[in-house]
């Protein structure tokens, strides 16, 4: 073992990087199903009132705001034999797969309205809580593998490529899978539009180290955000003044550009290890699970606000998901089948992550971390506050248009009022939120040079 590795600056193999990244691919097969299609399922297949669905999504996420810190605190204060963090991929992976399969039972479509509401509430709440048990320790694994900034960047890039593979598989594969199950023609324009925004990840993420050296950390973020804003502007102009179907190529190009802007959300995970290192520098402890739990709360806050606002406000504007023509097949068995396939494949990928990840840097506090100390950490760390704020806004921008994207390519099928509602959520609101993200990134204080200084000081303390 080299001196650098003794001090935590481990160099990782591609087997370790891909093994770790497979965990994000696995989780995205489930998370993207919920983010993009659960609302459509509840309103168009089960015919539950969109206002209730809106409240349900918000309520579950509020529960998670309390649940995630509990999970993070529990994990930080324990050290299981199979690994401080990786063991939960196994312990939580099995119930997560079962809960995902039970989320869209075909029998539920025949139940009474009250029973549907109880079923939707229980199944979604249980899935969300189990997901946190897997997601929080998974996010902590990265900070335990190495302190090396270059390795963290490569690991983040690998993780995000895998995550985006999961995203593109679900966003394009779900409508394709539904069409195949009910033996109808596949709407390739719709499937492409749903997923093509993920394509930039496969080009930009592998080139991230080079782009970061060329543009700088903040310069890279600003460039991506600017491209995204142009893409949203093009989509708005085409949707408002032209026939979308006549400009399909330009529409798909613009969607790719919006994906470039929203890719900033994926890159935010690279800042989490920085915040953890800064916390270790100040306190002497490395609260990886606690910080990841708070990041998870912020991430889910953006997701939940999007899920709450979208059906509610679109209904006020004039678009009711339950009564408008559905953009997807509504056969309950088709939804159940596709969801189960993604969940089962996800389980095997979680096991690959469990076997491929190696924890090199972990600390367990001498005394348990209290919730008061977690709050003090939040108040003491400006870096953490800014990163959490960015998480909320950028993922709100990402998810607020998720379910509505399925309707954009079919704008001509809807009334003028409904078209305006679709455009507001697929173009205007995400663009405004990206501008806010740019402002928050401007305030982020940790430069790469400062991080190197912090790591050297931590190393010097460990030798003393």
Regions found by a protein language model. Give the residues of each.
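Membrane-embedded alpha-helical bundles of multi-pass transporters/translocases
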Residues: 2-464
């Amino acid at each position: 073992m080299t001196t650098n590795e003794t001090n935590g600056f481990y160099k990782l193999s591609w087997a370790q990087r891909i093994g770790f990244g497979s965990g994000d691919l696995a989780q995205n097969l489930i998370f993207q199903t919920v983010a993009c299609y659960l609302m459509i399922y509840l309103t168009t297949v089960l015919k539950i009132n969109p206002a209730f669905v809106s409240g349900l999504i918000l309520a579950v996420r509020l529960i998670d705001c309390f649940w995630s810190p509990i999970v993070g605190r529990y994990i930080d204060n324990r050290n299981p034999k199979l690994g401080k963090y990786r063991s939960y991929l196994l312990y939580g992976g099995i119930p997560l797969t079962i809960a995902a399969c039970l989320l869209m039972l075909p029998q539920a479509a025949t139940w009474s309205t009250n029973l549907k509401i109880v079923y939707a509430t229980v199944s979604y709440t249980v899935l969300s809580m189990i997901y946190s048990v897997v997601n929080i320790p998974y996010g902590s694994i990265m900070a335990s593998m190495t302190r090396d900034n270059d390795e963290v960047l490569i690991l983040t890039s690998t993780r995000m490529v895998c995550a985006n593979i999961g995203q593109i598989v679900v966003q394009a594969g779900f409508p394709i899978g539904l069409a195949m199950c009910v033996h109808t023609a596949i709407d390739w324009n719709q499937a492409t539009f749903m997923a093509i925004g993920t394509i930039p990840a496969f080009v930009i993420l592998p080139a991230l180290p080079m782009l970061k050296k060329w543009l700088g950390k903040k310069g890279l973020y600003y460039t991506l955000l600017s491209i995204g804003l142009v893409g949203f502007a093009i989509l708005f102009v085409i949707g408002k003044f032209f026939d979308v179907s006549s400009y399909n190529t330009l529409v798909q190009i613009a969607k790719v550009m919006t994906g470039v802007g929203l890719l900033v959300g994926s890159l935010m995970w690279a800042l989490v290890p920085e915040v953890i290192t800064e916390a270790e520098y100040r306190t002497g402890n490395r609260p990886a699970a606690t910080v990841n739990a708070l990041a998870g709360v912020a991430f889910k806050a953006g997701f939940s606000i999007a899920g709450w606002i979208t059906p509610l406000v679109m209904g006020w504007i004039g678009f009711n998901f339950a009564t408008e023509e559905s953009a997807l097949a509504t056969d309950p068995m088709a939804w159940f089948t596709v969801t189960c396939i993604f969940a089962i494949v996800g389980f095997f990928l979680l096991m690959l992550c469990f076997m491929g990840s190696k924890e090199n840097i972990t600390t367990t506090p001498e005394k348990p971390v209290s919730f008061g100390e977690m709050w003090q950490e939040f108040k003491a760390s400006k870096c953490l506050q800014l990163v959490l704020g960015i998480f909320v806004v950028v993922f709100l921008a990402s998810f607020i248009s998720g379910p509505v994207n399925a309707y954009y390519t079919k704008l001509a099928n809807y009334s003028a009022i409904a078209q305006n509602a679709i455009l507001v959520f697929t173009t205007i609101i995400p663009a405004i939120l990206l501008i806010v993200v740019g402002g928050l990134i401007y305030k982020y204080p940790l430069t790469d040079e400062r991080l190197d200084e912090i790591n050297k000081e931590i190393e010097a303390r460990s030798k003393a």
